[in-house]
């Protein structure tokens, strides 16, 4: 018996919706990255995108434990000398909670072209409204 290798065009993709209300950011991001990679499937193949689509709702209600809201910084750089921009997570969660969740999930995906392809299947929304009802997403619960 030979080892099974998934083919990219033979993968059936489902849509899952995760409610982020009251969940720690790290646990939410870990589970979302697991689904995006396809590690929950028996047909997981590391070099093929076998993952499913993930919709995260209620991003503004995600929880950061400890003092991370005040101490953790979101950093980005313009590419120019002195171009480092720092934003505390408290301000980021007030203005753009979607970006905080996307940043956490992206850091848990592979840092290559395959990871970029997986990242395109992530959709994050501030509240419970999302435009993907036509895809009939299944609810995914995190303990």
Curated annotation (Swiss-Prot):
GO terms for biological process: negative regulation of translation; translation. Part of the 50S ribosomal subunit. It comes from Desulfitobacterium hafniense (strain Y51). PROSITE patterns: RIBOSOMAL_L13. The keyword Ribonucleoprotein applies. Disulfide bonds: none annotated. GO terms for molecular function: mRNA binding; structural constituent of ribosome. GO terms for cellular component: cytosolic large ribosomal subunit. HAMAP family: Ribosomal_uL13. Keywords: Ribonucleoprotein, Ribosomal protein. Pfam families: Ribosomal_L13. Gene3D superfamilies: Ribosomal protein L13. This protein is one of the early assembly proteins of the 50S ribosomal subunit, although it is not seen to bind rRNA by itself. It is important during the early stages of 50S assembly. This is Large ribosomal subunit protein uL13. The lineage of its organism: Bacteria, Bacillati, Bacillota, Clostridia, Eubacteriales. Belongs to the universal ribosomal protein uL13 family. The gene is rplM.
């Amino acid at each position: 018996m030979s080892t099974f290798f998934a083919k990219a065009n033979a993968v059936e993709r489902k849509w899952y919706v995760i409610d982020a209300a009251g969940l720690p950011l790290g646990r939410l991001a870990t589970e979302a990255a697991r689904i995006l990679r396809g590690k929950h499937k028996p047909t997981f193949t590391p070099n093929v995108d076998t993952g499913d689509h993930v919709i995260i709702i209620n991003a503004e209600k995600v929880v950061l434990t400890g003092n991370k809201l005040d101490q953790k910084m979101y950093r980005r750089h313009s590419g120019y000398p002195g171009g480092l921009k720092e934003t505390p997570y408290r301000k980021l969660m007030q203005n753009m909670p979607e970006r905080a969740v996307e940043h956490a999930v992206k850091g848990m995906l592979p840092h290559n072209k395959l990871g970029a392809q997986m990242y395109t299947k992530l959709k994050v929304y501030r509240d419970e409204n999302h435009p993907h009802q036509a895809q009939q997403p299944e609810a995914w619960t995190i303990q």
